Amino acid sequence: MFKRTVILLAGPTGSGKTAVSLKLAPLVDGEIISVDSMQVYQGMDIGTAKVSLAIRQAVPHHLIDICHVQETFNAVDFYYHAIQACQDILSRNKVPILVGGTGFYFHTFLSGPPSGPSPDFALREQLSLEAQERGIGALYQELVELDSAYAATITKHDKNKIIRALEIIRKTGNKVSSYSWESTVNESKEYHCRGWLLSPDPELLRHNILERCDQMLEEGLVDEVRSLVALGIKGNTSASRAIGYREWIEFLDAGSPVERFEDTKQKFITNTWRYTKKQRTWFKRYPLFRELSPMGMTLGDIARKIAQDYFLCG
């Protein structure tokens, strides 16, 4: 069958993915889908280098600010949200551009979701309305009564998971806990994917990370973390352990001692650098992502190269 083309733009933290994507989107009449496991959370702005609202108004973005920090969000959630976003973008004859550095989310998008029923967006909308009317706590209690085993694996704040679980139960009559959630390759996926991996020189990347971490601190990262702690981020293991957040949560928990600031900053930088190594290793396992070194190229040059490839092959 005919497959619509989707652009994938990956790379390690600090490689310039966001800047390139903002140049690329107008060239192909595209909209951006964030492939970042932390940008889904409201309030996690500075530490995730989230683009501003003004930029998002100029270039439409998807999968940003869709969860409260007390909710959990994983690769399965990402898959269904990303597919829905792709369908929406393509229905308006625009081009989906998936941009980010969360390798496992790209893997899930490419390989297909774990086994389980397909989403029922109408039923999901109905459940969302019920959550507004009855409260998410009431829906969680309903889930406890219908599938206590699965309910025990999440919290009463996990709105997305509670709604998805009740969606499955109401649609199929089966418990969520009865399904196998191991990922399988989906050979019949409907998208033709053109993948690119930004791979800057390690020294340039290290320089970018140093600047990035300094800039985040200047913009108020510590105050952002303090606000998120007040909102309950420590109850979300995934969000509270994210690089750029866990280091400063520990700093605040210790009473914000001045003498520990520089050590915490260095830990923040070191952890970010180590993560980029893991990202590069992950993406190089996938031949779909063609490596692109930005050396000697402007952001516009890179965007034009990707756009040219899209028009030739898309």
Curated annotation (Swiss-Prot):
Residues 36-39 are annotated as: Interaction with substrate tRNA. Monomer. InterPro entries: Dimethylallyltransferase, IPT, P-loop_NTPase. GO terms for molecular function: ATP binding; tRNA dimethylallyltransferase activity. Keywords: ATP-binding, Magnesium, Nucleotide-binding, Transferase, tRNA processing. Disulfide bonds: none annotated. Its cofactor is Mg(2+). It comes from Chlamydia muridarum (strain MoPn / Nigg). ATP binds at G11, P12, T13, G14, S15, G16, K17, T18. The gene is miaA. Its EC number is 2.5.1.75. The keyword tRNA processing applies. The keyword Metal-binding does not apply. It comes from the Bacteria. NCBIfam families: miaA. GO terms for biological process: tRNA modification. Substrate binds at T13, G14, S15, G16, K17, T18. Belongs to the IPP transferase family. The record marks T102, R124 as: Interaction with substrate tRNA. This is tRNA dimethylallyltransferase.
